[in-house]
Amino acid sequence: MVLDNLGKALANTLKKIARASSVDEALIKELVRDIQRALIQADVNVRLVLQLTREIQRRALEEKPPAGISKKEHIIKIVYEELTKFLGTEAKPIEIKEKPTILLMVGIQGSGKTTTVAKLARYFQKRGYKVGVVCSDTWRPGAYHQLRQLLDRYHIEVFGNPQEKDAIKLAKEGVDYFKSKGVDIIIVDTAGRHKEDKALIEEMKQISNVIHPHEVILVIDGTIGQQAYNQALAFKEATPIGSIIVTKLDGSAKGGGALSAVAATGAPIKFIGTGEKIDDIEPFDPPRFVSRLLGLGDIQGLLEKFKELEKEVEIKEEDIERFLRGKFTLKDMYAQLEAMRKMGPLKQILRMIPGLGYSLPDDVISIGEERLKKFKVIMDSMTEEELLNPEIINYSRIKRIARGSGTSTKDVKELLDQYRQMKKLFKSMNKRQLSRLARRFGM
C-alpha cells in the first residue's frame, strides 16, 4: 500500500476518536498531536504539518456538526477534508486536447523517470491513444535501450539515437518524426537533473523552448523525503511545472516528502507510481487517495480496475455456456489467476474495500498472495491434457506435479480442492450471474 505506515498511523488515530465515549478539547488536542507525529514520521515538512494540524484543531473545536451527524463523525470528516485539501482537493487529469499532445518529462537522477515514461506511455495506449516516445537523454547511454526493452513488447515506438550528443536536436527531430506519423501523444524523456547542475537545467529550458510541450511533468522520487521540497523549488524556477508524478510510493516510509513538494510548487500530483511493473501507475485522485490512506476504502478505484480488466479480456459466449454445464477446467482457473494478478497486488486491492482498511495483518495478506503464486507454479507443471481434463489427475500424477513444481503433494491437492469448489459454484449460478463474474475475473 502507498504510504502504508502513514496510513496505519492515521487510521489508528481515527479509530481512537470513533471508540471514545465522548469528545472534548483534550481528545481533539490528542488527535492533533497524533496526526502531527504520523506526518512528521512520514517526513512531511514540519512547517506544513503545523499549518495543516492548526486548521484541523481550529475546525474541530469551533464547528458544530450538521443535524444528524455526531461530533465524532464530523471530526473524522474534518480530518479527511483537510488532508484532501493539502493534497490538491480534486483530481486533475492530464488533458489530451490537441493532437499531438506533447509531454516533457523532467526529474532528478535516479527518480525512476525513464521507467515512468514507459508506464505513462502504456497507460495512454491502454486507453486507445497512439503514443510515441522520444529519448533525448544523451547523458545515460542505456536510457534508449531501457525504453525499447520496456515498450517494444507493447508495440510503442521509441525514437532515439545513442550516438547523438545534442539533446535539443534529438528532442526536436523526435517530435517532428512522431508528428509526421500522426500519433496522439508524444512523451519526451530527458536526462536526469540535479538541482545544482546549471548546465543541465539550461538544456532543459532550451528543449522546452524548441518542442513547446503542452505540459512539463516533474517526476519525484517518493523515497527522498523532505529533499523533494528543495528540488521542486529549483525546478519551479527553471521551468513552469505543469504537474508532478510521484514514484516509488509502494515501499517508502518517507513518501510524505512528496506532499511537501506539492505544497512548495503549487503543481498537482497527476499520477503516482505504485510498484515496479509497467502497469503500476495510477491517476492521483486526492479524495480517493485520502480515503484509502485513512482506511475508508475506495470502491470507485476497485470498479475501475474491474472495467480495465474487462477491456483486456475477451469473453466468449460459448465459455459462459460451458461453465454453466460444469465444464470448467484448470486452464480456465489459470486464466482467472492471471486476471487477478493483472489487477495488482492483493494488498492494494483489499485496501480499496471499505471496512477492511488496515484490519487485515500484512502477514495474512502475504500468505494469500503466496498461495496464489504457488497455485500458478503448480499449474505450470501440468500437461495440457491435465489442465483441460483435471479428472485424470491421480496420485501418481500428483506426485509428479509436486516434484516438477517444487511443492508438496498437499499443495497440489489443495489446488485441486479449490478448483472443484469453483467448478461447483459456477455450475450453481445462472447465466447472468456467471457472465458478470467471468468478465470481472478474466475467464
Curated annotation (Swiss-Prot):
GO terms for molecular function: 7S RNA binding; ATP hydrolysis activity; GTP binding; GTPase activity. GTP binds at residues 107-114, 189-193, 247-250. Its EC number is 3.6.5.4. It is found in: Cytoplasm. Keywords: Cytoplasm, GTP-binding, Hydrolase, Nucleotide-binding, Ribonucleoprotein, RNA-binding, Signal recognition particle. Part of the signal recognition particle protein translocation system, which is composed of SRP and FtsY. Archaeal SRP consists of a 7S RNA molecule of 300 nucleotides and two protein subunits: SRP54 and SRP19. This is Signal recognition particle 54 kDa protein.
